[in-house]
UniProtKB/Swiss-Prot annotation:
Residues 138-172 are annotated as: DYNLL1 and DYNLL2 binding. Transmembrane segments: none annotated. GO terms for cellular component: host cell; host cell cytoplasm; host cell nucleus; virion component. Pfam families: PP_M1. This is Phosphoprotein. Non catalytic polymerase cofactor and regulatory protein that plays a role in viral transcription and replication. Stabilizes the RNA polymerase L to the N-RNA template and binds the soluble protein N, preventing it from encapsidating non-genomic RNA. Also inhibits host IFN-alpha and IFN-beta signaling by binding and retaining phosphorylated STAT1 in the cytoplasm or by inhibiting the DNA binding of STAT1 in the nucleus. Might be involved, through interaction with host dynein, in intracellular microtubule-dependent virus transport of incoming virus from the synapse toward the cell body. Keywords: Chaperone, Cytoplasmic inwards viral transport, Host cytoplasm, Host nucleus, Host-virus interaction, Inhibition of host innate immune response by virus, Inhibition of host interferon signaling pathway by virus, Inhibition of host STAT1 by virus, Inhibition of host STAT2 by virus, Inhibition of host TBK1 by virus, Inhibition of host TLR pathway by virus, Interferon antiviral system evasion, Microtubular inwards viral transport, Phosphoprotein, Viral immunoevasion, Viral RNA replication, Virion, Virus entry into host cell. A motif (Nuclear localization signal) lies at residues 211-214. It comes from Rabies virus (strain India) (RABV).
Length: 297
């Protein structure tokens, strides 16, 4: 059963996005309270009205804040999700976030990458907030500080959207490069991708850390060797393994790595004992054969 490694930087980035989402919700709640400030009179009892009378809508040429919100998204919102009169939108949003968390856990257990799951989840949360908490039209009595806050929030949202589009474009370019000729080596486009590649390499090496591989010896025989005998830190092994042609590309795609080739490469570069035991020419041929077999499959 494969293990899932989540990078601390990815978790911190996710927590930062959640904090931004909470701040957005607080601002939305404040706008909703401001828009409902005029609803301080006695409520109209409609229990005794005929059933069809309750469905009537009054058209006013002077739209209020609440009426503007209703015109912007009421029709589609009622078709997709009918909210009861007594339900609090904040509670519904909290319930939605709980369901999102459960879905993230399920997707991670199924083997999907955390960064891919999180980017999709952020887009879904933004869409939910946009549909269910639309921005009300401006009022003449609106406070200037609220207007300034709204403009700053809009600029931040636009900037974040532009950054996401830019990163997606870079990721697509990297994928096209990776799918080109085998001689072209995939390179990480940002820190998150690079960390995910390192995590995949470390995961596969750690699973076979004590597994012995056969290597040609100088005495025309063979000898057994494993990663544990290198006496190296796993991070240093991963750093050296990334220099093996084709390994970062295979790790990015989630494919199986040629671990014997990686071990031979790291051993030649860092272990004097391995250098004394192995026959270099035969090892080079074995490593090249392993690379060709894994990159062509």
């Amino acid at each position: 059963m494969s293990k899932i490694f989540v990078n601390p930087s990815a978790i911190r980035a996710g927590l930062a996005d959640l904090e931004m989402a909470e701040e957005t919700v607080d601002l939305i709640n404040k706008n909703i309270e401001d828009n409902q400030a005029h609803l301080q009179g006695e409520p109209i009892e409609v229990d005794n009205l005929p059933e069809d009378m309750r469905r009537l809508h009054l058209d006013d040429e002077k739209p209020s804040g609440l009426g503007g919100m209703a015109k912007a998204g009421e029709v589609k919102y009622r078709e997709d999700f009918q909210m009861d009169e007594g339900e609090d939108p904040n509670l519904l949003f909290q319930s939605y976030l709980d369901n999102v968390g459960v879905q993230i856990v399920r997707q991670m257990r199924s083997g999907e990458r955390f960064l891919k799951i999180w980017s999709q989840t952020v887009e879904e949360i933004i869409s939910y907030v946009t549909v269910n908490f639309p921005n009300p039209p401006g009022r003449s009595s609106e406070d200037k500080s609220t207007q300034t806050t709204g403009r700053e929030l809009k600029k931040e949202t636009t900037s974040a959207s532009y950054q996401r589009d830019s990163q997606s474009s870079k990721a697509r370019m990297a994928a096209q490069t990776a799918s080109g000729p085998p001689a072209l080596e995939w390179s990480a486009t940002n820190e998150e991708d690079d960390l995910s590649v390192e995590a995949e390499i470390a995961h596969q090496i750690a699973e076979s850390f004590s597994k012995k591989h056969k290597f040609p010896s100088r005495s025309s025989g063979i000898f057994l060797y494993n990663f544990e005998q290198l006496k190296m830190n796993l991070d240093d092994i991963v750093k050296e393994a990334k220099n093996v042609p084709g390994v970062t590309r295979l790790a990015h795609d989630g494919s199986k790595l040629p671990l014997r080739c990686v071990l031979g490469w790291v051993g030649l570069a860092n272990s004097k004992k391995f250098q004394l035991l192995v026959e270099p020419d035969k090892l080079n041929k074995i490593m090249q054969d392993d690379l060709n077999r894994y990159t062509s499959s």
